[in-house]
């Protein structure tokens, strides 16, 4: 009955969306394509060629990897058999301020995987609270794992995830793992699907230079319908982009929810230092440490140390998402601020590694991340200007174009294996516009960081003048950049 109700609601949602598109089409005057609109169409088309060519390229590459390349590679891994088994598996879980129910789900799945993978395994628990340790010990005693499965606790101060990871990596170093050992780094809100360890650990024997790989994600959201759909859409987009970048062995982030590394990587003092105390020397904002973005730091460290990165699309995990605010608008903006800040803090120095290290396609993708904050809002800005100059029909034309293209993009996302819903087209456009505005805002404020789960913010300890200068120079540059952007478009439309 519940399934039928859900299906009917989905169908009603799609019918409502299609009705909106038909209403927009009916409202358009026949004179919309006269000579007055040539500059409008040229600008929208020129930017569209760049944006859609990047999207289509990612999609085609992703489908080639998912349905052609990866199945071939998986057959090669299976032929290796037990020769691809690592000597030891470390499953390291970091937990802080996560509710007991989620913690129990996470450790239940981790202990199950440690037992069922059939390999010598050590579960490393990087914990802050004693209550979590008591819970894990109780679950461990109940599971009664075989002797080849060990348990190791690392007590850490509640000073952030980076410190928790570094303490855990040093604890693994004390086990003195050999070159065939691997380490899975798992977040405290990540529930492992069955067989995820067995599906991820053999790849390091197939690819000698892969230093780390990451996994496919699905989610359970403790929030409303729109918040849930928003997260699910992001994971569907992530899946295609990961597949695309895996084709070049240049996956752009070692996702903190679950990634697997060679043990010799996470025990490398340089790698530990990169994750624990990563920093950026900015020409205007000075030198500051990274509070968040350990997944980006680990990726950059792998690139700098000369390793490749990979993605295993059929190794899935389920994350339990706790929105930081009850309001969708507030929660999504807060999460975007953190995610895009992490992305942009890594972007410029990643490009500094050079085309020879990154490859041509990866360099283009990183460059696109920098310009997309402006190209994403160009169409809407031009449509608004044109509607003031020539009439509101131009805005209707733009909205119809957006509605049709986002519908097509949503249907294409279904090929990723993730479910789609009728809210996806509108959420896609919300992400484009609000995401671009958040990127512009954070681009000029890279030194401002905070966690969404815990009340931890970056303390700069700057002199009063430096703090004043950073604040006002950020505001001035944001206003100047926005003004120049609009002024240029006003002269062109």
From Swiss-Prot:
Gene Ontology CC annotation, any one: plasma membrane
Compartmental location: Cell membrane
One GO BP annotation of this record: alginic acid biosynthetic process
Top-level taxon of origin: Bacteria
Membrane-spanning parts: 13-32, 47-69, 380-402, 422-444
Key word Nucleus present: no
Pfam family, one: Glyco_tranf_2_3
Membrane disposition: Multi-pass membrane protein
Biological role stated in the UniProt entry: Possibly a processive enzyme that polymerizes GDP-mannuronic acid.
Protein name per the record: Glycosyltransferase alg8
Organism: Pseudomonas syringae pv. tomato (strain ATCC BAA-871 / DC3000)
Gene name tied to this protein: alg8
């Amino acid at each position: 009955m519940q399934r039928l109700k859900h299906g009917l609601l989905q169908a009603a949602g799609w019918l409502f969306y299609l009705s909106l598109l038909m209403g927009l089409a009916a409202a358009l005057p026949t004179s919309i394509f006269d000579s007055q609109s040539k500059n409008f169409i040229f600008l929208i088309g020129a930017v569209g060629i760049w944006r859609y060519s990047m999207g289509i390229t990612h999609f085609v590459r992703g489908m080639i990897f998912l349905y052609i390349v990866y199945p071939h590679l998986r057959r090669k891994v299976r032929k290796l058999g037990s020769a691809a088994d690592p000597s030891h598996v470390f499953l390291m879980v970091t937990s802080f301020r996560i509710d007991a129910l989620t913690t129990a789900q996470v450790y239940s799945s981790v202990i199950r995987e440690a037992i069922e993978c059939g390999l010598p395994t050590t579960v490393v628990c990087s914990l802050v609270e004693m209550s979590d340790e008591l819970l894990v010990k109780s679950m461990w005693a109940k599971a009664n794992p075989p002797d080849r499965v060990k348990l190791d606790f690392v007590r850490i101060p509640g000073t952030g995830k980076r410190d928790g990871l570094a303490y855990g990596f040093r604890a693994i170093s004390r086990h003195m793992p050999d070159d065939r050992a691997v380490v899975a780094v798992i977040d405290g809100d990540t529930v492992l699907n069955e067989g995820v360890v067995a599906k991820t650990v053999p790849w390091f024997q197939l690819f000698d230079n892969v230093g780390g790989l990451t996994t496919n994600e699905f989610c359970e959201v403790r929030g409303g319908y729109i918040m849930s759909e928003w997260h699910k859409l992001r994971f569907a987009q992530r899946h295609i982009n990961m597949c695309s970048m895996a084709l070049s062995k240049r996956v752009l982030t070692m996702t903190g929810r679950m990634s697997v590394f060679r043990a010799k990587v996470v025990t490398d003092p340089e790698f530990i230092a990169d994750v624990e105390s990563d920093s950026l020397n900015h020409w205007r904002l000075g030198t500051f440490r990274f509070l968040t973005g350990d997944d980006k730091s680990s990726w950059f460290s792998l690139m700098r140390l000369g390793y490749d990165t990979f993605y295993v699309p059929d190794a899935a995990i389920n994350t339990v998402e706790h929105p930081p605010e009850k309001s969708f608008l507030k929660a999504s903006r807060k999460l975007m601020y953190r995610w895009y800040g992490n992305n942009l803090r890594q972007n410029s120095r990643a490009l500094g590694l050079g085309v020879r290290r990154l490859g041509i396609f990866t360099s283009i993708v990183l460059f696109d991340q920098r310009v997309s904050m402006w190209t994403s809002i160009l169409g809407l800005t031009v449509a608004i200007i044109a509607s003031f100059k020539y009439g509101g029909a131009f805005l209707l034309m733009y909205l119809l174009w957006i509605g049709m293209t986002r519908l097509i993009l949503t249907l294409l996302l279904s090929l990723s294996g993730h479910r789609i819903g009728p809210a996806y087209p509108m959420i896609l456009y919300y992400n484009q516009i609000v995401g671009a505005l958040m990127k512009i805002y954070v681009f000029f404020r890279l030194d401002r960081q905070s966690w969404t789960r815990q009340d931890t913010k970056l303390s700069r300890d700057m002199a009063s003048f430096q703090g004043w200068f950073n604040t006002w120079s950020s505001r001035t540059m944001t206003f100047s950049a926005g003004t120049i952007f609009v002024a240029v478009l006003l002269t062109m439309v």
